[in-house]
């Protein structure tokens, strides 16, 4: 099962943090669920959450990069389901590399909630819907907020 080995993670107190959520519109039902759960988790943690939508996963990095300049953290959400061509690999690699580069270049946490699955059923199982085994939208938000808090602590003590 996919949850095996995951650390126990609690919703952090993110009061005062500003986080953006950028969500792709492809695979709308899945992405809308990821988006709702990420936004709900951010607000429940006390963060100020702003919301943005883009067409697809390839458009995520450029918008995330712009938002990383003005936010404590950014969450990128999308869903790429494998098809019959190599396009899946190109999209997944480009998005993952882009989001990682942005996080490193800006020192801003980027929660990567872009699902990369072989089937739509796998995406549904990870999107936090009824019967899901995981909730990658909320998990990406918690990871981004937690990392922003760690960076804030480091900057305050190393300052």
Swiss-Prot record:
<feature type="binding site">
    <location>
        <position position="126"/>
    </location>
    <ligand>
        <name>(2S)-2-hydroxy-3-oxobutyl phosphate</name>
    </ligand>
</feature>
<dbReference type="GO" id="GO:0009231">
    <property type="term" value="P:riboflavin biosynthetic process"/>
</dbReference>
<dbReference type="GO" id="GO:0000906">
    <property type="term" value="F:6,7-dimethyl-8-ribityllumazine synthase activity"/>
</dbReference>
<dbReference type="InterPro" id="IPR002180">
    <property type="entry name" value="LS/RS"/>
</dbReference>
<dbReference type="InterPro" id="IPR036467">
    <property type="entry name" value="LS/RS_sf"/>
</dbReference>
<comment type="pathway">
    <text>Cofactor biosynthesis; riboflavin biosynthesis; riboflavin from 2-hydroxy-3-oxobutyl phosphate and 5-amino-6-(D-ribitylamino)uracil: step 1/2.</text>
</comment>
<dbReference type="GO" id="GO:0005829">
    <property type="term" value="C:cytosol"/>
</dbReference>
<feature type="binding site">
    <location>
        <begin position="84"/>
        <end position="85"/>
    </location>
    <ligand>
        <name>(2S)-2-hydroxy-3-oxobutyl phosphate</name>
    </ligand>
</feature>
<dbReference type="Pfam" id="PF00885">
    <property type="entry name" value="DMRL_synthase"/>
</dbReference>
<keyword id="KW-0686">Riboflavin biosynthesis</keyword>
<comment type="function">
    <text>Catalyzes the formation of 6,7-dimethyl-8-ribityllumazine by condensation of 5-amino-6-(D-ribitylamino)uracil with 3,4-dihydroxy-2-butanone 4-phosphate. This is the penultimate step in the biosynthesis of riboflavin.</text>
</comment>
<feature type="active site" description="Proton donor">
    <location>
        <position position="87"/>
    </location>
</feature>
<feature type="binding site">
    <location>
        <position position="112"/>
    </location>
    <ligand>
        <name>5-amino-6-(D-ribitylamino)uracil</name>
    </ligand>
</feature>
<feature type="binding site">
    <location>
        <position position="26"/>
    </location>
    <ligand>
        <name>5-amino-6-(D-ribitylamino)uracil</name>
    </ligand>
</feature>
<feature type="binding site">
    <location>
        <begin position="57"/>
        <end position="59"/>
    </location>
    <ligand>
        <name>5-amino-6-(D-ribitylamino)uracil</name>
    </ligand>
</feature>
<protein>
    <recommendedName>
        <fullName>6,7-dimethyl-8-ribityllumazine synthase</fullName>
        <ecNumber>2.5.1.78</ecNumber>
    </recommendedName>
</protein>
<dbReference type="InterPro" id="IPR034964">
    <property type="entry name" value="LS"/>
</dbReference>
<comment type="similarity">
    <text>Belongs to the DMRL synthase family.</text>
</comment>
<feature type="binding site">
    <location>
        <begin position="79"/>
        <end position="81"/>
    </location>
    <ligand>
        <name>5-amino-6-(D-ribitylamino)uracil</name>
    </ligand>
</feature>
<dbReference type="GO" id="GO:0009349">
    <property type="term" value="C:riboflavin synthase complex"/>
</dbReference>
<keyword id="KW-0808">Transferase</keyword>
